C-alpha cells in the first residue's frame, strides 16, 4: 500500500513524468520547474561532516489544503505519523517559536525540540531547526516548500522538502542521508494521504484554485 | 525516587538470594541468619513494591492467575508410562507498564483454547475424538506493540480466534490412519496454520483505506505458544521470546527477529531495504525488529511471517516462559529459567516466605517481572509462565495450601 518501496519518484528530477500524461515536453517542463524551485529555495551549504538532500512529492490536492497542513508548526501530528504529541512554548506562533515534540515508541528517539525559522504564507515556505531532543540529528535544518501544479488536468501540489544535518559518529554520510530520507518519505506519503482525503471531503470551487 | 530505587535494589537482592539459594546448603551459619533477617525486612519492602507497582500498574492478566490455582488442584498427575502430558498444570501471567509512559504490551491466555469455538465445528465421524485432543491444548501469547497499542490489542483480540479457525480447517481435512507420515503431516499443518493465522491478522490490522494518520506506523511483535499433550508449537514474529526449561536447562523455542541477524539482514537487503545502526541496528534506521504484525509503512522489508518451532514434549519439560523484550533485555534465558524453577519448586517461597509469596506460575511470572524492574528495564514488561510438570513436592504443596 504505502510502503517505501524502491527508489523512483522521490528525488528531484527523478519523476519527470510526475505531472502525468503530458508527454516528454510537459515532463521536461515539470522537471525544469522543480530544478528552479530547488535552486531558488532549497540551497543548503553542507559542511565537511554534514549531509544534505531533497525529496519531492506530487499530491493530488490543491495547494491551500496542503499548505494548511504543512504550515501548522504547532500541530505536526496532523500529518506526521511518528509524532504523538506537540506543545509550543509560550503559545503564540511566530518566528523563533519552539515546539516540544514527543515521538511514538519503537523509534530511535522519544523527544525533539524544534524552532520555527521561517514561515512565509505568500511563498509557502516553512523552515525548522532542531535545537534539542534525544535523537541523533545535530544541527538539523529543514525547508519545506509547496507549489501549485496541474496533475491530470486537476489542481495538484508539488512539495519539496530539503535538509542538512551533521553526520553522527559511527555513521557514514550515506547512512545518515538514507535514514533521514526514510523518515521524510514517511512524512510526505502521509501528507499526501491526509491532503488527498481532505480534498475528497471538501472539493474546492474553481475560484479557490 | 530514591526510596523507590532502594526498594528496587532490595527486590533485586531478594532475587539474587533466590538465585543463590540453589547452590547453598541449609546450614544456618551466622551470615545465613543475618541474610534471613535482612530478607525479612525485604519481605515488607518487596510487598510494598508489589503494592505500588503491581496493584497500580499490573494489568489484570486475564483470569489466568486465579484460574491457575483452580486448575492446579484438579489437574491429573502425569503418569510416566504414557507419552501424553496434561497440556499444562497451571499458568500465570503478569504484564506491567514499567517505566514507560504508555502501555503497549498485551498478553492473552486461553486454556483450553479450541473448545470456545466448538460450535463452529462441522459435525461428522471422527470429530469427537479430535475434540477430545483439542480440549487439552492451551494458547499463550505475548504481544509487544510499538507506535501505539492498537495492533497489540488487535492481536490480543484476534490471534487465538483466527488460529482456532485455521487449525480447525486443517484438522477436519486430516484423513484417518496412523504412522510416521501422520506425525510429519501434523507438524506441517501446524506450521501452515500459524503462518496463515499471522498473515490474516496482519491483513486485518492494516486494512482500512481511510486509516488515520499514524495507522501505517503501528505494529506489534507476537510470540504464540500452543501447548498440547504431546508437543509444544511456538510461532514467533519479532523480538519477544519463548524459552522452555527442560531438566533445568533453558531451551529457546524462538529466535529473535533482529535486523542484524545475518539471515534477516540478507532478506531485508534482497527486498531493497537497508539495515542501519542508528541507536542499535534498525530497518531503514527506524525500526529495531525485522518482523512484526502491522507496520505497513515498512513493508516489504518488515514481514509478518512467523518462524514456527514444533517441539515434542519429554518428561523432563518443566515450564515455558513467554516474555517481551522488557524482560529479555535485562535477564538471560538461563537466569529467567533458574528464577522460575526456584519459585515453582517452592524452594523460593519456603526459604523467603515474606519476599516470595508462593509457588504458582503467577508467582513465578511476578518474580521475573520484579527482577526485570530491579535490573533497570525501561520498557513494558510482560511474562507468561506455563507450568508443564509439577516441580513442587506434595508435602511442600500441602504445607503451602494449609498456610
Curated annotation (Swiss-Prot), chain A:
In its UniProt entry, the species of origin is given as: Oryza sativa subsp. japonica
Q: What does this protein do?
A: Intracellular abscisic acid (ABA) receptor that functions as a positive regulator of ABA signaling pathway. Together with ABI5, PP2C30 and SAPK2, is part of an ABA signaling unit that modulates seed germination and early seedling growth. Acts as a positive regulator of abiotic stress-responsive gene expression. Inhibits the protein phosphatases PP2C06 and PP2C09 when activated by ABA.
Oligomeric form and interacting partners: Monomer. Interacts with PP2C30. Binding to PP2C30 is dependent on the presence of abscisic acid (ABA). Interacts with PP2C51. Binding to PP2C51 is dependent on the presence of ABA. Interacts with PP2C50. Binding to PP2C50 is dependent on the presence of ABA. Interacts with PP2C53.
Question: Segment START-like: which positions?
Answer: 44-196
Which BP terms does GO give this entry? abscisic acid-activated signaling pathway; response to osmotic stress; response to salt stress; response to water deprivation; seed germination; seedling development
Q: Belongs to which family?
A: Belongs to the PYR/PYL/RCAR abscisic acid intracellular receptor family.
Cellular localization per UniProt: Nucleus; Cytoplasm, Cytosol
Q: Which UniProt keywords apply?
A: Abscisic acid signaling pathway, Cytoplasm, Disulfide bond, Nucleus, Protein phosphatase inhibitor, Receptor, Stress response
Q: Which factors induce or repress this protein, as stated in its UniProt record?
A: Repressed by abscisic acid (ABA) and drought stress.
Q: Name one GO molecular function term.
A: signaling receptor activity
Q: What else is known?
A: Plants overexpressing PYL5 exhibit abscisic acid (ABA) hypersensitive phenotypes. Plants overexpressing PYL5 exhibit tolerance to salt and drought stresses, but are hypersensitive to osmotic stress and ABA during vegetative growth.
Where on this chain is Gate loop (motif)? 105-109
Tissue specificity here reads: Expressed in leaf sheaths and leaf blades. Expressed at low levels in roots, flowers and seeds.
Q: Where is this site: Involved in ABA binding?
A: 81, 180
Keyword set includes Nucleotide-binding: no
Report the record's disulfide bonds.
Answer: 51-177
**Site positions for Involved in interactions with PP2Cs:** 108, 172
SUPFAM superfamilies registered for this protein in UniProt: Bet v1-like (SSF55961)
Tell me what this protein is called. Answer: Abscisic acid receptor PYL5
Recorded hits in InterPro entries, A to Z, give: Plant_def-hormone_signal, Polyketide_cyclase/dehydratase, START-like_dom_sf
What positions does the entry give for abscisate binding? 80, 109-114, 136-142, 161
Q: Where is this motif: Latch loop?
A: 135-137
GO CC entries? cytoplasm; cytosol; nucleus
UniProtKB/Swiss-Prot annotation, chain B:
* Keyword Magnesium recorded: yes
Give its E.C. classification number: 3.1.3.16
Sequence segments annotated as region (Disordered): 42-80
Q: Required co-factor?
A: Mg(2+); Mn(2+)
Query: In the record's cofactor note, how is the cofactor described as bound?
Result: Binds 2 magnesium or manganese ions per subunit.
Q: Where does Mn(2+) 2 bind?
A: 144, 325, 379
Q: Which Pfam families does the UniProt record give?
A: PP2C (PF00481)
UniProt lists compositionally biased (Low complexity) regions at 62-71
The Swiss-Prot or TrEMBL record describes its family as follows: Belongs to the PP2C family.
What is the name of this protein?
A: Probable protein phosphatase 2C 8
